[in-house]
Amino acid sequence: MNVKNPPFSVVRGSAAARIALSFVHARDRIDLVAAEILAIEARAEQTFFCDDTGAYHTFQLPHVQLEFAPHIGARIHRLTSQILDEELALLVDGEVIVRPVVREPIGWRGHMSLSANDMDEAEQLAGRLRRCWVNPVLRVV
């Protein structure tokens, strides 16, 4: 082994310690590592497409937008398709941060949004979710 230039690896502890975000319901649990979360963004407005008119409408609706790797979006969609009108717990660091009621299947397009009462609440929720993107610890192996 070359002592002057030792190899490095990124280590964040056990498998459980590497979980960034979890979706938990009695039917299933989906654990995500940080690399499977592509974006977390607090937004003030949300745009919807109206099937009846074919038009897009934008409303002042504070929320947090989450974007996932495609395979994760598919798993979330399968789960939420089965649990309509039921709670789905979202955990960060093993702590439940929100328990939204699933009103429609989510995740099919690889993203979802979590409603907030105002932008301050959206920013706080986004901040808690971003905690999963901590700087890794480097260790000589």
Model-found features: residue ranges?
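Structural signature of multi-pass, alpha-helical inner-membrane proteins
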Residues: 1-141
